[in-house]
Amino acid sequence: MSGKDRIEIFPSRMAQTIMKARLKGAQTGRNLLKKKSDALTLRFRQILKKIIETKMLMGEVMREAAFSLAEAKFTAGDFSTTAIQNVNKAQVKIRAKKDNVAGVTLPVFEHYHEGTDSYELTGLARGGEQLAKLKRNYAKAVELLVELASLQTSFVTLDEAIKITNRRVNAIEHVIIPRIERTLAYIITELDEREREEFYRLKKIQEKKKILKEKSEKDLEQRRAAGEVMEPANLLAEEKDEDLLFE
């Protein structure tokens, strides 16, 4: 096992405890990121479905608005000059809010009307009904465009967040966790090898002590048999206490 396949660490009981804690932390992080990815994917699919529905509705609304414009021009004449002259400031404005999905911030756009209708009196002479219908259709078109912009922005943001989250999950699952597991296996192998070496060393020491003891006892027996070693005298057996008489 090369050094690149595992973390460079001195094998010890403390290192084993640290690696076990790191492995547990990596597994917990992987599980949390998977849950985050699932939540983002669920919201991503919901937004994708909503985008498809909004685009289909947008096509119908824009087609209806185009027909209304042609009808209004046919009835009321060319009113583009009047519309341009009455423009002072935007009546339809956009504000942005934020939505949070599993820690990912999504922008949400909303449209609102500000001020009075500058074209309220347009079409009093003729074509008033057609102009009112035209305004309603294009107001609906603006509403759908803002909603579609919000959905598509959220779509792109979620797509990038899901890719990043999945890359992190894959990195933890296929790189970090296996590397920690290989390091942990290396530490356990080294510690087991040390224990075997220590057991073998102690066993050899005991065997050597036993051999030396047996050799010493054998030499002592041989010296005793040759009379070189005298048996120690029993001092207690030779001593005789005098009788004490008390008058």
Swiss-Prot record:
GO cellular component terms? centrosome; cilium; clathrin-coated vesicle membrane; vacuolar proton-transporting V-type ATPase, V1 domain
List the signal peptide residues. none
Does the keyword Membrane feature in the UniProt annotation?
Answer: yes
Q: How does it sit in the membrane?
A: Peripheral membrane protein
Gene3D superfamilies noted in UniProt: 1.10.287.3240
The lineage's top-level taxon is Eukaryota
Arranged from A to Z, the UniProt key words for this protein are:
Cell projection, Cilium biogenesis/degradation, Cytoplasm, Cytoplasmic vesicle, Cytoskeleton, Hydrogen ion transport, Ion transport, Membrane, Transport
What GO molecular function annotation could you give as one example from this UniProt entry?
A: proton-transporting ATPase activity, rotational mechanism
| GO BP terms, alphabetized | cilium assembly; protein localization to cilium
Show the InterPro entries listed in the entry.
Answer: V_ATPase_D
The listed locations are: Membrane; Cytoplasmic vesicle, Clathrin-coated vesicle membrane; Cytoplasm, Cytoskeleton, Microtubule organizing center, Centrosome; Cell projection, Cilium
Q: Does the keyword Cytoplasm apply?
A: yes
Q: Name one Pfam family in it.
A: ATP-synt_D
Q: How does it assemble?
A: V-ATPase is a heteromultimeric enzyme made up of two complexes: the ATP-hydrolytic V1 complex and the proton translocation V0 complex. The V1 complex consists of three catalytic AB heterodimers that form a heterohexamer, three peripheral stalks each consisting of EG heterodimers, one central rotor including subunits D and F, and the regulatory subunits C and H. The proton translocation complex V0 consists of the proton transport subunit a, a ring of proteolipid subunits c9c'', rotary subunit d, subunits e and f, and the accessory subunits ATP6AP1/Ac45 and ATP6AP2/PRR. Interacts with SNX10.
Question: Into which family does the record put it?
Answer: Belongs to the V-ATPase D subunit family.
Functional description taken from the UniProt entry: Subunit of the V1 complex of vacuolar(H+)-ATPase (V-ATPase), a multisubunit enzyme composed of a peripheral complex (V1) that hydrolyzes ATP and a membrane integral complex (V0) that translocates protons. V-ATPase is responsible for acidifying and maintaining the pH of intracellular compartments and in some cell types, is targeted to the plasma membrane, where it is responsible for acidifying the extracellular environment. May play a role in cilium biogenesis through regulation of the transport and the localization of proteins to the cilium.
PANTHER family, A to Z: V-TYPE ATP SYNTHASE SUBUNIT D
Question: What's this protein's name?
Answer: V-type proton ATPase subunit D
Q: Which organism is it from?
A: Oryctolagus cuniculus
